[in-house]
Amino acid sequence: MAVTDRDIFTVTRLNQAVQGLLEGTFPLIWVEGELSSVSRPASGHLYFTLKDSGAQVRCALFRNRAQLMRFRPADGMQVLVRARVGLYAPRGDYQLIVEHMEEAGDGALRRAFEELKQRLEREGLFDAERKRPLPRFPRRLGVITSPTGAAIRDILSVLRRRFPGLPALIYPVPVQGAAAAPAIAEALRTASARKDCDVLILARGGGSLEDLWAFNEEIVARAIHDCEIPVVSGVGHEVDVTIADLAADLRAATPSAAAELVSPLRDEWLLHVERQRRLLVERMQRGLQHQALKLDNLERRLRQQHPERRLQNQAQRVDELERRLALAMQHRLRHRESRLARLQDRLQHRSPARALERLEAREAQLRLRLDSALRRRLDRFEARLAAAGRALHSVSPLATLGRGYSILTTAEGQVIRDASQVQVNDRVEARLGKGRLSCTVVTRYEG
């Protein structure tokens, strides 16, 4: 064969051809194996090797898928992956491009259960303080379960035995599979919104952990927490504990036990009804007695306030007031007559004419005494005034001047008492008994 007739592949072309062959032959497959060489760089992608006792294969799980995992992969874990077979052309290595990874076996479910349980417990969804009491005598029971399963048959059997008259409203849901958890949560929300029943039973028969997994979903736990009606969980057998059991207001070991807890015994109910009947009769009797007593009181008050009775009372009161008015008028009249007599007697003794005569005589006497006193007082004042005038004249400067003396003053009007107050040639003024003189100092003598 000539060289030109050969179909020669480049390395790149070969790897691309193998890549297309692998991807076309193995579109999506499930592979189980043990993790090793787990690596998670800063990019967020996950790289690891999947191996068993005879072989190994490289795997890549990209970041957008890795973020959806419910566990943290580690070396030695047994896992199940859903992947496409591919080839990394630059190195010629074939690998698995993983789209989903889960832990293999019940161990994975158990770890997921514990992680969710711890997270919800930290949020307080399981706190005893939020658990609500069950109604002692419910009017209607709601049951969320499969309409064809053994759980509903067991519940209805218990209800027929304990209390046949208790109506049960069934909310049919699937209790296993991918659609179960959303359907159960929606049934809880519907029952809470409608409020057609007083208590709810969430029930399912026994099964494996995987069979019961719908009752371990977070969406169901939160729907129970948000439900406004008390919820009793009766899922599986006594050894089975689900997240729904922990979130419910009360957990029952089985669906039958849940029905026992929420339904009263017929005899107990009848006893309760009889007790309520007696209480009602007693209350009615007390009420009737109370109303009868009120009626008697009203009749007595009506008799006391009857118009005829009131008119009689008013007539008696009018008579009494008339008698008291007559006595008061007589008493007042006698008092006025007595006072008038006293005033007349006093008037006779105190006649205005006599009083006027006495006043005129006293006035004349007082006039005489006043004139005499005024004359004597005026004479005394005149004598004192004359003496004061004589004394004043004796000390008056004018009198001194009249005896030949004079008063010298400076040109400024200052009285000169000492020769040192003036100088030779100073002008001085001399005041005489009559008139004034203007003088000039010719000579000054000291001492």
UniProtKB/Swiss-Prot annotation:
Reaction catalysed by this chain? Exonucleolytic cleavage in either 5'- to 3'- or 3'- to 5'-direction to yield nucleoside 5'-phosphates
Compartments reported by the entry = Cytoplasm
Chief localization class?
A: cytoplasm
Q: Write out the entry's keywords from A to Z.
A: Cytoplasm, Exonuclease, Hydrolase, Nuclease
UniProt-listed InterPro entries: Exonuc_VII_L, Exonuc_VII_lsu_C, OB-fold_nuc-bd_dom
Q: What is its EC number?
A: 3.1.11.6
* One term of GO molecular function: nucleic acid binding
| HAMAP family, alphabetized | Exonuc_7_L
Q: Which family does it belong to?
A: Belongs to the XseA family.
- Do you know which NCBIfam families this protein is assigned to? xseA (TIGR00237)
Subunit text: Heterooligomer composed of large and small subunits.
Q: What does this protein do?
A: Bidirectionally degrades single-stranded DNA into large acid-insoluble oligonucleotides, which are then degraded further into small acid-soluble oligonucleotides.
Descriptive protein name: Exodeoxyribonuclease 7 large subunit
Supply the source organism for this entry. Thioalkalivibrio sulfidiphilus (strain HL-EbGR7)
Its taxonomic placement starts with: Bacteria, Pseudomonadati, Pseudomonadota, Gammaproteobacteria, Chromatiales
Instruction: Name the gene for this chain.
Output: xseA
